[in-house]
From Swiss-Prot:
Its EC number is 3.2.1.21. It is an enzyme of class 3 (hydrolase). The lineage of its organism: Eukaryota, Fungi, Dikarya, Ascomycota, Pezizomycotina. It comes from Aspergillus terreus (strain NIH 2624 / FGSC A1156). It is found in: Secreted. Keywords: Carbohydrate metabolism, Cellulose degradation, Glycoprotein, Glycosidase, Hydrolase, Polysaccharide degradation, Secreted, Signal. This is Probable beta-glucosidase M. It comes from the Eukaryota. The active site is at D303.
């Protein structure tokens, strides 16, 4: 991308290496000036849409503040709580301060809370209603613990880099699926206790209990070089995500647009650089894309220690620094005095923060910030119960629906009254301890000696208990009178020749701070082939924090069933047993593409590394544009092991009766001009097309099907997900599934007009079971 971003100062900061005279090493960031267009000034929040009352109150509040009090709202401070970050109180105006804490799959570092299914698990459920329920119940736990801001959900990384260490925190590699689920998640968190959600009655005693923070804005796709570092006395900058305008809008910005449209009150900017400008002081992305184009009314917070500039960051659109700042404080008021920053910018920063507090009604009967977040749970503290019996059904259902059955031969599953089960693999058992601890970062491909139910880093969570697979299998065996043998240590275990089934448990670990060392693990694969060599009914379960390749053994005749179990949270074993024994029917679908071999992912397999003249300023060129995951496989004609959207069931579904109907709305190329609302031009959400199809359960077991709609848009990838509905269908019955498509769904980003544009020509419509199993095909024209 270096050749076409309009380099300014081409020769600035270039030196000739004596070790390699032919290589000109870039030694100053002035070389990159101008690659990310400047957008100033930072737009003031205007209280559009549902924010009007909150802004009215916030402006009146901020008008009473001293300059010092305004500044204090913009940066975290140390506290005697276990909150990840704290904004100080303003006692004279009855503002109690703010507690912000991880994570997007449940609270971390405290007690009396639940470990919820992770983002990738929710993504694999393909269930919008369940995503909202999960978010609501998580939100109530944060509320009870006095946490004002939930640091989640995550929609970046999107999953561009297959080995990305934090891909598991997000929902999917597809922007549409990720966007649909983040919309429901934001709604669930921020409306906890106020609104109603399908199949859930929300107690009225909680009033808009929580707010969320969507992260990480944007283009944050690898851990390698995510932060600047010093190696042998040499400073190396953060990696730069070099993203063109089209890919930015059609991939990386898409789910953030859905989050803003849902009303998210805050957004976290990311660590890395975007087009060679640090994300937390990138005026193009913060002022231009987020606050102007998307009409974002909330505030922008740094990731922890993610501030790299002082007044420049404030002018570029940053509103809050965590966990503290060394660059703001009195420097903000000094900047106003010397004219390098407008007083209105500080007012807007404070107003956005306070408006967000009012927007979720935290001025009314909210617990004291951090009341349930002790700094050290091993010291005497008040027991504040976050978890609730009301959440148990959602907790278990969420764990169940994120499992994806990808192989099931010889009628291996569901299990039919086995006399003897044999359990193998390090992932089968619970760990040797379960204590409340802080974040940990371990660079490993697997987690040995315990079942993997959540990933590593700041996105991990605290559990009320962990019901591991081996424990759950034994509980079921006790009820049924089944014998159970196990060896969860050996790589080549003995197998009783009369066993009915061998259950093998492995995992694929990932964590913040490191990109994954690979997509396979030799010891785990050897274990599987060793067991399969002795057992003709080997059922493999993989708890995977990301894509896991299975090509070395997937076609082994004795490997009869395989489940991608992802990261189910604390109900991991209970959920799995419900599926193994057929009390629940598998309904998860892959939110990513599983290749046959690592090389099929091409340049998207590994993170970018510092190299050549960019050794001090690592570059990650997103030169593939919009072609990641299944889009890339489709473009290159590569057959995957398991395609995006794939998943098996214990029943079967038939599709028929496709109907495509254009709604009576204008189909002019560009949307009509309108005042920007949350999420952008409101006309982007006009319904343009409806599609319906009949889905019949032709099997003998009740089940849930995920009907998926893909569009072939002219001048775009051959197929893109643009609709999905998860429907429960009793055996032998049929339902009519309807999809509603908006102007945005049918458009591509016009880089010249800087607008979403409908294409002239024939659109292809596909409906079916996955991105490559699409029995229904139709067409319409614009």
């Amino acid at each position: 991308m270096h050749s076409f971003l309009g380099l300014v100062g081409l020769l600035a900061g270039v030196s000739v290496s004596s070790a390699a005279p032919s290589v000109q090493n870039i030694t100053s960031d002035t070389y990159f000036y101008g690659q990310s267009p400047p957008v100033y000034p930072s737009p003031e929040g205007n209280g559009t849409g549902s924010w009007a009352v909150a802004y009215q109150k916030a402006k009146a509040f901020v008008a009473q503040l001293t300059s010092e009090e305004k500044v204090n709202l913009t940066a975290g401070v140390t506290s005697d709580t276990g909150c990840s970050g704290m904004i100080p109180a303003i006692p004279r105006l009855n503002f109690p301060g703010l507690c912000v804490s991880d994570a997007g799959d449940g609270l971390r570092g405290t007690d009396y809370v639940n470990s919820w299914p992770s983002g990738i698990h929710a993504g694999a459920s393909w269930n919008k209603n369940l995503a909202r329920q999960r978010a609501y119940h998580m939100g109530t736990e944060f509320h009870k613990k006095g946490v004002n801001v939930l640091l989640g959900p995550v929609v970046a990384p999107l999953g561009r880099v297959v080995e990305g260490g934090r891909n598991w925190e997000g929902f999917s590699n597809d922007p549409y699926l990720s966007g649909a689920l983040v919309y429901e998640t934001v709604k669930g968190i921020q409306s906890a206790g106020v609104g109603a959600c399908t199949k859930v009655r929300f107690p009225q005693r909680l009033q808009s209990s929580g707010s969320n923070l969507v992260q990480h804005f944007t283009g944050y796709e690898q851990e390698t070089n995510r932060n600047p570092e010093t190696v042998d006395g040499v400073d190396i900058a953060s990696v730069s995500s070099n993203i063109d305008d089209k890919a930015m809008h059609e991939l990386y910005l898409w789910p953030f647009q859905d989050a803003v449209h849902a009303g998210s009150v805050s957004v976290m900017c990311s660590y890395q650089r975007i087009n060679n400008s640090y994300a937390c002081q990138n005026s193009k992305t913060l002022n231009g894309l987020l606050k102007t184009e998307l009409g974002f009314q909330g505030y922008v917070m740094t990731d922890w220690y993610g501030q790299h500039g002082g007044i420049a960051a404030a002018n570029a659109g940053l509103d809050m620094v965590m966990p503290y700042t060394e660059l703001w404080g009195s420097n903000l008021t000094d900047a106003i005095s010397n004219g390098t920053m407008e007083a209105s910018r500080l007012d807007d920063m404070a107003t956005r923060i306070i408006a967000s507090w009012y927007q979720v009604n935290q001025n009314k009967n909210f617990p004291a910030p951090g009341i349930g977040m002790p700094a050290d749970v091993n010291e005497p503290h008040q027991a504040v119960i976050g978890k609730s019996p009301d959440s148990r059904t959602t907790l278990l259902q969420g764990a169940i629906e994120g499992h994806v059955l990808v192989k099931n031969t010889k009628q291996a599953l569901p299990l039919q009254s086995p006399r003897l089960l044999s359990v193998f693999g390090y992932d089968a058992k619970a760990g040797d301890s379960l204590i409340v601890n802080d974040v940990s970062f371990v660079n490993a491909s697997v987690q040995k000696n315990h079942t993997l139910y959540v990933g590593g880093g700041s996105g991990t969570n605290s559990a009320a208990y962990v019901l591991a697979p081996l424990d759950a299998v034994q509980q079921q065996a006790y009820e049924d009178g089944t014998s159970v043998l196990w060896d969860v240590v050996s790589e080549d275990p003995d197998v009783d020749a009369t066993t009915d089934a061998c259950l093998v448990f492995i995992n694929a670990y990932a964590t913040e701070g490191y990109d994954r060392p690979g997509l396979v693990n030799k010891e785990s694969d050897t274990l599987i082939t060793n067991v399969a060599g002795k057992c003709n009914n080997t059922i493999v379960t993989i708890h995977n924090a990301g894509i896991r390749l299975v090509g070395d053994w997937i076609n082994h005749e004795n490997v009869t069933a395989v489940i991608f179990a992802h990261l189910p949270g604390q109900d991991t074993g209970k959920a799995l047993v419900e599926l193994l024994y057929g009390r629940a029917n598998p309904s998860g679908r892959l939110p990513y593409t599983v290749a046959k071999r690592a090389g099929d992912y091409g340049s998207l397999l590994h993170p970018s590394q510092p190299e050549g003249k960019y050794g001090l300023f690592p570059q990650s060129d997103f030169s593939e544009g919009v072609f990641i995951d299944y889009r890339a496989f489709d473009k290159q004609g590569i057959e995957p092991q398991f395609e995006f959207g794939f998943g098996l069931s214990y029943t079967s579904f038939n599709y028929s009766g496709l109907a495509v109907k254009k709604v009576n709305r204008t189909t002019e190329p560009y949307p009509a001009s309108a005042p920007v609302q949350e999420g952008g031009n409101p006309n982007l959400w006009d319904e343009i097309l409806t599609v319906s199809a009949k889905v019949q359960n032709s099997g003998s077991m009740d089940g849930d099907e995920v009907a998926q709609l893909y569009l072939g848009i002219p001048n775009a990838p051959v197929r893109q997900l643009r609709g999905f509905e998860k429907v429960g269908i009793p055996a032998g019955q049929a339902v009519n599934v309807k999809f509603s498509l908006t102007r945005r769904d049918l458009s591509v980003w016009d880089t010249e007009a800087q607008q979403w544009k409908l294409q002239s020509g024939d659109y292809q419509v596909y409906v079916g079971r996955s991105s490559r199993d699409l029995p229904l095909k139709g067409q319409f024209s614009i």
